[in-house]
């Protein structure tokens, strides 16, 4: 099932298919790409004119009806008033009307129900005393269409706090919060705490701020000194994490493999190697992530099958790698693979449990095991570098623990029950890999988080690589 839409409908779909298995006895694949509480952080070093242009495109293009659209503009206190004054002026120059005309900037929302929901939200904010600004360029031709169409004027709502916005408003409504420079880490934590992680923008000329935001934000697509919409296939692979989507990213190397029931284990590695021949891969982080796997490989000296699996998974693992993607001059696009935080591993056989452990350690994730005799005994026997990556939890309520991926070995009835229990959870959709006892073809790419970063290098003075062209 491939789905684009709301988080609520994606959750219903997952619960609907959780009780079904395919012809091979595996869970039905679900790729869900949902919405987000997308923010843009603007500090005092940003160029205001460029910020306004990018905010208009990100918040109001397609009448704000893009899943990637900007929903919350976060302005540093020192430049908030000046930026808002210029933004209000720009909004007042926008023409709203028939999108078939080239002179139109903002078209209608999709239907009358959407219009009513958006207007209800705006009225709720007004009743709470929040400043609301609406403006559009007056034109008699457009005005006639407003009466018969489902139009909502571009709207600016000032909030006291990011947490005031509890859900995505899918339309031409931009919320604004102000922040103190010293409170930037807390602001990023608030954005992460929303649970959504689709797009995030940052406008700044300070490299340290770029590194701080991109290094700590839990979002699938990050944009620096540019707008946040219009991702291009193969240039900015698109898709979120958490409540914003299951992965893999559309337009990225992992997507088509998610649709295959069977494929060679090395297929993804071959695909990436072909790409790496043209653009070198940065794998500095991978070495640090795989240290526990190396410890498990040494411990398995008398277990040749497990040792061979450790070697195989270690060679196939791609977590901790960053790749430069093709793109226009003046823009730098990278695609990074990171490990999921914690993987629930369920098995009733020691060899299967160790197979799961090797796969999870290969990508650098933590392991969640049921607290039973089999797994307690294994934890005691394993080296400390490995056992430190394992958490035990009571088996009867283990699905209530935090985890973002599942690997299961067992029979189909147990697998179906596990899928239903995982689907019944609140929060982000979690995918389950199911295998019969003894299988070792675990798909490591299902344990990755993908991050796309698009940087407007021209905004910081130009593309220095052009100087090397001879």
Specify the residue positions occupied by each region the protein language model found:
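ALDH superfamily catalytic-core signature
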Residues: 7-160, 182-185, 224, 252-318, ...
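Short beta-alpha connecting loops at secondary-structure transitions
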Residues: 37-41, 104-107, 174-176, 239-246
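Conserved phosphate/anionic-ligand binding catalytic regions in large, soluble enzymes, centered on
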Residues: 232-233, 237-254
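Conserved glycine-rich beta-strand-loop-beta hairpin in the small C-terminal domain of fold type I
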Residues: 149-153, 167-174, 193-198
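Short hydrophobic alpha-helical runs that function as membrane-insertion/retention elements
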Residues: 199-203, 222-223, 367-370, 391-393
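Short hydrophobic alpha-helices that are characteristic scaffold elements of the AMP-binding
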Residues: 361-362
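A short, charged/proline- and glycine-enriched loop
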Residues: 336-342
């Amino acid at each position: 099932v491939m789905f684009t839409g709301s988080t609520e409908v994606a959750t219903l779909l997952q619960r609907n298919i959780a009780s079904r298995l395919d012809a091979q006895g595996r869970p039905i694949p679900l790729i869900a790409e949902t919405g987000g509480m997308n923010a843009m952080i603007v500090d005092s070093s940003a160029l205001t004119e460029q910020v306004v242009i990018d905010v208009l495109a990100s918040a109001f293009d397609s009448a704000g009806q893009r899943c990637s659209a900007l929903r919350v503009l976060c302005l540093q206190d020192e430049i908030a008033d000046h930026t808002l004054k210029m933004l209000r002026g720009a909004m007042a120059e926008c023409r709203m009307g028939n999108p078939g005309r080239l002179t139109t900037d903002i078209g209608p929302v999709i239907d009358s129900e959407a219009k009513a929901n958006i207007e209800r939200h705006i009225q709720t904010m007004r009743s709470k005393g929040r400043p609301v600004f609406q403006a559009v360029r007056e034109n008699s031709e457009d005005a006639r269409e407003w009466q018969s169409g489902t139009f909502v004027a571009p709207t600016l709502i000032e909030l006291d706090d990011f947490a005031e916005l509890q859900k995505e408003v899918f339309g031409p409504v931009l919320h604004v919060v102000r922040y103190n420079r010293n409170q930037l880490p807390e602001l990023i934590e608030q954005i992460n705490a929303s649970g959504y992680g689709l797009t995030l923008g940052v406008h700044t000329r300070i490299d340290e701020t770029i590194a701080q935001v991109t290094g700590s934000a839990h979002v699938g697509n990050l944009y620096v000194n540019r707008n946040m919409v219009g991702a291009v296939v193969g240039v900015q692979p698109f898709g979120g994490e958490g409540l914003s989507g299951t992965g893999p990213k559309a337009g990225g190397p992992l997507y088509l493999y998610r649709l295959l029931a069977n494929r060679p284990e090395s297929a993804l590695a071959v695909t990436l190697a072909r790409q790496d021949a043209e653009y070198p891969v940065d794998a500095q982080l991978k070495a640090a992530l795989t240290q526990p796997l190396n410890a498990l490989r040494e411990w398995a000296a008398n277990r040749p099958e497990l040792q061979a699996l450790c070697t195989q998974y270690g060679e196939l693992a791609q977590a901790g790698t960053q790749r430069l993607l093709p793109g226009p001059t003046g823009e730098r696009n990278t695609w990074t693979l990171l490990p999921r935080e914690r993987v629930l591993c369920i098995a009733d056989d020691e060899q299967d449990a160790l197979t799961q452990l090797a796969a999870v350690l290969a990508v650098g994730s933590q392991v969640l095991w049921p607290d039973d005799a089999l797994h307690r005994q294994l934890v005691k026997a394993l080296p400390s570098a490995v056992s430190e990556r394992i958490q035990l939890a009571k088996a009867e309520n283990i699905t209530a623990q935090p985890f973002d991926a599942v690997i299961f070995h067992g029979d189909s009835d147990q697998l179906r029950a596990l899928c239903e229990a995982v689907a019944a959870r609140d929060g982000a959709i979690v995918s389950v890999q199911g295998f019969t006892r003894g299988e070792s073809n675990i798909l490591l790419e299902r344990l990755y988080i993908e991050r796309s970063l698009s940087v407007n290098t021209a905004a910081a003075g130009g593309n220095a690589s052009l100087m090397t062209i001879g």
